[in-house]
Amino acid sequence: RWSAPDDQFAVRFNTTTEEIKGWLKNSLVVEPGTRAYLVQEGEYLGEFAPGEYTVQSFVEKLQFWRKGQTTVIISRSEILPITLPSIDVVTSDDFVVSIEARCTIQMLDIQRFLLNLLGPKDQFSIADLEARLAPVIKQILWHTVGSRTLADVKSPAIAHEISKQAQEAINLSFQRYGIQFVEVETLSAKSEE
């Protein structure tokens, strides 16, 4: 059974053709909420969605699979919610607003993720992902909220607009990492007036 550990966004391991065939003797299950990607000699071979695979279905899916070492990357495929710590932002009328935000993300392009984010590491934890996200989201919220008044920020319509602008900006920033932001939601905006 292949699945991503609870605290990991993606893990990588190396195996051989013989080991994979041994796992497939009966069948190999890619767990729900997981995708398996296979790379051989730096070449992307294909991916496996959740489901059960046999030697025949495995080989049919990977037309160019050869003997030798194969790298398997197990990644979360479900939409993953991440709640970020509160961020203090100054509005255009000089009020400090504490903003809590939550975003939902999903793996979009494994090749970009491997090249630009995972790199030589064998794992990329959810904590690593949160650490990468926090400064980008903070900067985007500073920009989008900092150009608004306190009354604007507390308005539901403007809060939705801020979330939309933040999502577009974050997607642009993280597109090169192969990660898609499904939603960026402002949970609360509190200030001491």
Task: Annotate each predicted stretch with a short phrase.
Residues 1-47:
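N-terminal, positively charged regions that mediate nucleic acid binding
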